[in-house]
């Protein structure tokens, strides 16, 4: 199937808004590119609802249609006729744009409201003939895609009647005998899929891209508005508003037929999911569903340059005009005309389910997903902030295991990891403070040792002085002993005892010299050792001083990190809270307006 939604992935910042609004699990794939989280489209799973285009603030997502090819073929002279969706009536300059297309060579311009009238007729006759238990309407191809891909059990409930736009194309080809290539001026991105699957329409020319082309090329539209090349439609003009088909059916059946409706992001696909699980006895006869909250008037391929209130006002004026112009008698004549001219089978569609890749999900698989997300407690598993794009942590665990998302996209896991870093940083601050205190204490002790060394150095200096005195005394004693020996020798036998004493004194003086000499050597070595120790202590003190400064700087840095982490955690919590709040906001407000009961005389029904 054709890829309609595309992307400029370089612009993606991984904000996850596209995942959050997407009704399909796995239609978006999260991955990392150079440490930047990116989200790409999985074309096989995409249903072309267009929600991601509207929600993307970075202009990553965009759609592709056939506007350029249509205009190129028109310039080459290829015969092309077109039909126009009823949404054109709320587009400023829309009818002048159609006149410009006529001047470019378009052969015929048909109001698709005729197809809407045919669609209503076909539904009425189908319901009357078959009395179906339940019918899901199918004007929106995105919803048809969703059911054909993901809700096969609901295919049997899909209305067999073609959409109003396809009914128009079939009428043009089979009943108006138009052999031209058919283009659709469309408010819908996903119509390209419907046209591809059915083969009647060659070009999906979206209103938005056609208007962009006219504006970008400075084309001045003619003042004259274009009309249509077919009869005026009746209630089919209301199809582009929410509940348009419902209003058409109720004009015929009244309130005897239960018709429920659902439209818009956050409502319609959840309702379809619930429909699939509902007790069949609780289902309405007709379930009128639209992809867009404001219907086709503000569809996925329409510039939203007009408010919903202005749109409702225009549609209310259109309804009042219709009620003044057409009454039940006219309506019955129109249905009778279709009975005579149209073959019901021409407007019936058959559906085939589409296969998509799927993987069985078990509780063990989910548990492994929780482990990858570091979720072990019940609180962690039910945090459900939706910041990752998934509504619940369960869905995120599932997406991680299916390869659709990555753990790094979990804000709670990042929060926990940052908290761990914070705790480590706080612990490091405590350790650094203790180390700083220890170093200060060592510095104090080093200072005390330095003082001891100074005292010791002074003592050694005094010891050297004393040693020198002893050496001097020993030298002098030695001289005295020598003189005494000489005098004892002169005295002969009488000086013999004195000679012995002199000899002992001389020996003692010699030993004193030796001791002093050894002491001087030890003193020199001690002095060198003390000097070396003193130098070492000086170096150590300097190193400790530098370490102390570094630790102080580290402490300050860690404190700043802790403060910034606290701020970051607060910010992330606010983001998560905001995300949850946004996820709980209603998608849109449904407004209702009263129908007018004024009827004028109706014109004769003619084709």
Predicted ranges, named:
Residues 377-383, 403-406, 412-452, 456, ...:
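HAMP domain helices
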Residues 430, 437-446, 526, 530-600:
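Alpha-helical coiled-coil heptad-repeat segments
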Residues 2-5, 10-14, 45-46, 285, ...:
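Short, flexible, mixed-charge glycine/proline-rich loop motifs
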Residues 2-4, 13-42, 47-66, 300-305, ...:
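Iron-sulfur cluster-binding cysteine motifs and their immediate structural context
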Residues 458-476, 487-542, 549:
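Parallel, heptad-repeat alpha-helical coiled-coil signal-transduction segments
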Residues 599-607:
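Intrinsically disordered, low-complexity terminal
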Residues 63-374, 378-383, 391-402:
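Iron-sulfur-associated redox domains of electron-transfer enzymes in respiratory
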């Amino acid at each position: 199937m054709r890829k309609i939604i595309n992307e400029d992935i370089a612009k993606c910042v991984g904000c996850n808004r596209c995942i959050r609004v997407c009704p399909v699990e796995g239609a978006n794939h999260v991955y990392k590119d150079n440490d930047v989280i990116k989200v790409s489209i999985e074309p096989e799973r995409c249903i072309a609802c267009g929600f991601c285009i509207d929600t993307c603030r970075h202009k990553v997502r965009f759609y592709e249609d056939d506007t350029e090819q249509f205009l190129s073929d028109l310039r080459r002279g290829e015969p092309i006729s077109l039909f126009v969706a009823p949404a054109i009536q709320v587009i400023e300059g829309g009818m002048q744009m159609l006149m410009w297309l006529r001047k470019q060579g378009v052969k015929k311009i048909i109001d698709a409201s005729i197809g809407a009238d045919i669609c209503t007729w076909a539904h009425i006759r189908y319901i009357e003939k078959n009395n179906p238990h339940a019918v899901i309407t199918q004007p929106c191809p995105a919803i048809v895609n969703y059911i054909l891909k993901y809700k096969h059990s609901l295919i049997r409930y899909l209305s067999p009647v073609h959409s109003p736009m396809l009914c128009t194309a079939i009428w043009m080809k089979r009943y108006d005998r138009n052999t031209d290539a058919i283009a659709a001026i469309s408010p819908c991105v996903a119509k390209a899929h419907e046209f591809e699957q059915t083969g009647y329409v060659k070009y999906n020319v979206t209103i938005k891209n056609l208007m962009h082309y006219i504006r970008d090329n400075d084309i001045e539209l003619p003042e004259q508005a274009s009309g249509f090349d077919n009869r005026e439609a009746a209630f089919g003009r209301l199809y582009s508003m929410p509940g348009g088909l419902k209003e058409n059916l109720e004009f015929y059946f009244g309130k005897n037929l239960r018709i429920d409706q659902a439209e818009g992001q956050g409502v319609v696909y959840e309702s379809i999911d619930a429909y699939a699980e509902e007790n069949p006895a609780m289902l309405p006869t007709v379930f009128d569903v639209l992809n867009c909250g404001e219907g086709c008037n503000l569809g996925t391929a329409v510039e939203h340059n007009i408010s919903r209130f202005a749109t409702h006002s225009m549609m209310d004026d259109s309804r009042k005009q219709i009620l003044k112009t057409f009454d039940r008698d006219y309506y019955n004549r129109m249905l009778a005309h279709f009975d005579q001219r149209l073959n019901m089978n021409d407007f019936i569609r058959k559906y085939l389910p589409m296969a998509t890749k799927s993987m069985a999900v078990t509780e063990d698989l989910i548990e492994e997903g929780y482990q990858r997300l570091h979720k072990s407690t019940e609180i962690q598993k039910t945090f459900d902030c939706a910041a990752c794009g998934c509504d619940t942590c369960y869905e995120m665990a599932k997406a991680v295991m299916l390869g659709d998302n990555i753990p790094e996209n979990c804000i709670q896991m990042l929060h926990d990891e940052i908290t761990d870093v914070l705790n480590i940083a706080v612990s490091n601050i405590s350790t650094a403070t203790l180390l700083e205190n220890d170093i200060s204490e060592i510095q104090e002790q080093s200072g005390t040792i330095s003082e001891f060394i100074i005292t010791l150095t002074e003592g050694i200096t005094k010891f050297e002085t004393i040693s020198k005195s002893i050496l001097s005394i020993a030298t002098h004693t030695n001289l005295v002993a020598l003189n005494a020996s000489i005098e004892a020798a002169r005295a002969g036998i009488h000086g013999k005892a004195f000679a012995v004493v002199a000899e002992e004194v001389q020996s003692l003086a010699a030993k004193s010299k030796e001791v002093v000499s050894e002491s001087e050597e030890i003193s020199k070595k001690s002095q060198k050792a003390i000097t070396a120790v003193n130098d070492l202590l000086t170096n150590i003190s300097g190193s400790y001083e530098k370490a102390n400064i570094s630790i102080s700087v580290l402490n300050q840095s860690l404190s700043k990190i802790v403060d910034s982490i606290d701020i970051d955690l607060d910010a992330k919590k606010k983001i998560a809270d905001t995300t949850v709040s946004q996820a709980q906001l209603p998608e849109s407000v449904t407004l209702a307006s009263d129908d007018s009961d004024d009827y004028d005389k109706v014109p004769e029904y003619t084709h």
